[in-house]
Regions:
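Structured surface interface patches that mediate subunit assembly and partner/cofactor docking
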Residues: 2-24, 39-60, 67-79, 96-272
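Hydrophobic-composition signal
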Residues: 35-36
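N-terminal interaction modules that seed assembly of large macromolecular complexes
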Residues: 80-90
């Protein structure tokens, strides 16, 4: 509707709301400045969202691990992993965050920052060639799936990390989480992260850690027969969004058909 005061919008109660005036940029430079401002706003929003997701996933993960009975740590949990192994594997989300941020600092030598034997190894840059730039969480997960997915190595790293958690994995995980959350809080979203498959910024890497904590938090809850904590349930929506971004080609159709009840997913279908 329009009136004497210019264009108006109608709100949900049928009341007219005056539209804000829109000034068109005068030239191409103004358009470019506007685009830069928009890009910066989008980046800030993405950074805030990734931090919120990581905080929720971490809180839920710590809670579910802390509730696990110690006498069940040797029970089967996921594939070849015991419950301890699974907790150890998932806790590496914190270790990789620390180590890859450390490796991304200027003039920083690659490798674990504190000598931990269970720390991931970050690669020495190839002479004369910088590691590739990864522009999104999806790009990292796809690259990691191709280059870091040796099942035996993944299994063994999980077991080593699980043993390193000691007699009280709940307390050990809580300490790792507190350290990582504090690190994230004092680090800019555009800080460089150097992973084995490429370089990226923290705001793009953080969702991959939140995804690990979310999915494996659910695995742990299932293994011990407990309802996932509320914080983990909050983390489900961004995890599903990231799963959707990982789909490509016919997989998009396959998943949509399954989600709308037309057919079941193929046997052992997985995005990761």
């Amino acid at each position: 509707m329009t009136g004497s005061g210019g264009p108006t919008l109608t709100d949900g109660h049928g009341q007219e709301v005056a539209a804000a005036p829109c000034a068109l940029p005068a030239d191409g430079a103004d358009w470019a400045e506007g685009a830069d401002a928009t890009d910066a706003a989008v980046a800030r929003s993405a950074d805030r969202q990734s931090r919120r997701w990581f905080a929720a996933a971490s809180a839920g993960f710590v809670e579910i691990v802390g509730s696990c009975p110690r006498d069940r740590l040797t029970d089967p949990a996921l594939g070849e992993w015991t419950l301890r192994d699974l907790i150890g594997h998932a806790s590496r989300a914190y270790l990789t965050l620390e180590d890859y941020l450390e490796a991304g600092r200027p003039a920083c030598a690659a490798g674990p920052s504190d000598g931990r034997q269970d720390s991931p190894r970050t690669p020495e840059p190839t002479a004369g060639r910088r590691p590739p730039r990864l522009g999104s969480p999806t790009a990292y997960l796809l690259a990691a799936r191709s280059g870091l997915a040796d099942p035996t190595a993944v299994r063994d790293r999980g077991r080593v990390a699980g043993e390193a958690l000691g007699d009280n994995p709940g307390q050990a995980v809580a300490r790792l989480a507190a350290r990582a959350v504090a690190l994230v809080a004092r680090t800019s979203g555009d800080a460089e992260v150097l992973t084995p498959v490429g370089r990226m910024v923290l705001s793009d890497y953080l969702p991959t850690r939140a995804f690990e904590l979310t999915v494996h938090g659910l695995d742990i809850a299932r293994a011990v027969g407990r309802r996932p904590p509320a914080a983990l349930r909050v983390a489900l929506r961004p995890a599903l969004h990231l799963c959707a971004d990982l789909l490509s080609g016919d997989d998009r159709m396959t998943v949509l058909v399954a989600l709308t009840g037309r057919a079941a997913l193929p046997h052992r279908f997985s995005l990761v």
